[in-house]
């Protein structure tokens, strides 16, 4: 069982007011935050903390991760005419964002050559 604690008294003053997660089954403690000597997420044997007094901190446990499968699809929905107009009148489309090789980019930030390339690759007559 995992218990959240705040150390209230310890021989090592760097531990006072630090927060930990205690794993009773493994006899380990995971540092949530401490003033010094311990890094966030560092796991140590409980015995390494020495003589301590603590108060329990309520933990909000979330259910385990449920994997349902599925896929992710990213679609650009626009017309060729919109991109061509954005080339001619960039001031009309300051927020026009497109996907290029998996990255989001402002269409107006592309060079004219890159803009033509995007239009050519995005809108084809046949597969």
Curated annotation (Swiss-Prot):
The keyword Nuclease does not apply. GO terms for cellular component: cytosol. GO terms for molecular function: formate C-acetyltransferase activity. It comes from the Bacteria. InterPro entries: Auton_GlycylRad_Cofactor, Form_AcTrfase_GR_CS, Gly_radical, Glycyl_radical_cofactor_GrcA. Disulfide bonds: none annotated. Coiled coil: none annotated. SUPFAM superfamilies: PFL-like glycyl radical enzymes. The modification Glycine radical is found at residue 102. Keywords: Organic radical. It holds the Pfam family Gly_radical. Residues 5-127 form the Glycine radical domain. Acts as a radical domain for damaged PFL and possibly other radical proteins. This is Autonomous glycyl radical cofactor. It comes from Serratia proteamaculans (strain 568). The gene is grcA.
């Amino acid at each position: 069982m995992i218990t959240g604690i705040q150390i209230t008294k310890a021989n090592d003053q760097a531990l006072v007011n630090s927060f930990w997660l205690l794993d009773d089954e493994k006899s380990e403690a995971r540092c949530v935050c401490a003033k010094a000597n311990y890094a966030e997420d560092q796991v140590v044997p409980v015995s390494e903390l020495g003589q301590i007094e603590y108060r329990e901190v309520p933990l909000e446990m979330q259910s385990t991760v449920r994997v349902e499968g599925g896929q992710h699809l990213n679609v650009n929905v626009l017309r060729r005419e919109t991109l061509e107009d954005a080339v001619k009148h960039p001031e009309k489309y300051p927020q026009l964002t497109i996907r290029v090789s998996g990255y989001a980019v402002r269409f107006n930030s592309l060079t004219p050559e890159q803009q033509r390339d995007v239009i050519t690759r995005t809108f084809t007559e046949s597969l």
